[in-house]
Amino acid sequence: MSEARPRHIPVLGPEAVTLLAPRDGGIYLDGTFGAGGYSRLILEAAATRVIAIDRDRSAIAGGFDLVQGAGGRLTLVEDRFSNLAEVCAAQGAPAVDGVVMDIGVSSMQVDQADRGFSFRQDGPLDMRMGTDGPTAADVVARASETDLANIIYIFGEEKFSRHVARAVIAARKEAPITTTKALADIVASVVRAKPGQIHPATRTFQALRIFVNEELDELYQALAAAERVLKPGGRLAVVTFHSLEDRIVKTFLAERSRVGGGSRHLPELAQAAPSFTVLTKRPTTAGDAEVAANPRARSAKLRGGERTAAPAHRPDDLPGWPTLAGVMKAGVTRAGR
């Protein structure tokens, strides 16, 4: 396979593909195409077919050379990975042998100042992975102080969330907050960081990005969809980069692999048959060499499971993942919904 696009090595890419164990003739779903690193590794590992999804139109356009070099074995689809079951069916592959997902914003998106993901370079306060729905600037402009504080606390795990929200509300009364630098400066004025710690705006930017893109709900829906499309013996590999994502994946696999049953007195408490076997009792993390080459890998965790022959569970059978059911966007509707 040959292509002109620079080679991209994804975080924990070799480990994720080893976990998937691609085989000749197998069909694999890359739920987060990005720069194409996982898709490329799967295509190189065996004579496979890969269906790759990304909601970012620029990522799909950037994959043209890889598609050309794959000899008809790679199909790119612009969509959300929560719709992966529908995508697979539309591509004539209602059941697949493996699913890989790399959760969160890509390095490619962070490096583009005009996408508004990074506080390290100035750009419009956008943060959308696609082209639909409200931007981060919309949320910052319209959310109430309470809603904004809850967003930052729940999705950013920022202990100074109320201070940040108060500062944002005060600042927007003076002038609209429309750039990443403007927001980062506001956050830095109330959140102090010691030398060697993360940038003061890190958690606030994470929270807004997750909220704007509905990332946690998307992740859970994608996991449930993967459960439906994986063949018995098919494998799921998920790379996460922060505790909220990892908690969802860990809980999903734990719930889906749990063995239990009701008693003759309370048969209604019987546990559904396990739909997964956990392959990673502890998450796989990046080694020193990978972290040195790519600092983003420091927080990465890889978890995986193998599909059993049991029916898929109901998609609402995962308690306790973080949501904002009680938080309305004060005039800002959820992206694309």
Swiss-Prot record:
Q: Which UniProt keywords apply?
A: Cytoplasm, Methyltransferase, rRNA processing, S-adenosyl-L-methionine, Transferase
- Write down any Gene Ontology CC term: cytoplasm
EC numbers, comma separated: 2.1.1.199
Read off the SUPFAM superfamilies from this record: Putative methyltransferase TM0872, insert domain, S-adenosyl-L-methionine-dependent methyltransferases
Instruction: Give a GO molecular function annotation for the protein.
Output: rRNA (cytosine-N4-)-methyltransferase activity
Identify the stretch(es) annotated as Disordered.
295-323
Q: Highest taxon of the source?
A: Bacteria
Alphabetical list of InterPro entries matching this protein = RsmH, SAM-dep_MeTrfase_MraW_recog, SAM-dependent_MTases_sf
List the Pfam families. Answer: Methyltransf_5
Q: What is its main location?
A: cytoplasm
Instruction: Please list the residues that bind S-adenosyl-L-methionine.
Output: 36-38, 54, 81, 102, 109
Per the record, the GO terms for biological process are: rRNA base methylation
Can you say where in the cell this protein is located?
Answer: Cytoplasm
What the record says about family reads: Belongs to the methyltransferase superfamily. RsmH family.
- What is the stated purpose of this protein? Specifically methylates the N4 position of cytidine in position 1402 (C1402) of 16S rRNA.
| Protein name per Swiss-Prot or TrEMBL | Ribosomal RNA small subunit methyltransferase H
Give the organism, scientific name: Rhodopseudomonas palustris (strain HaA2)
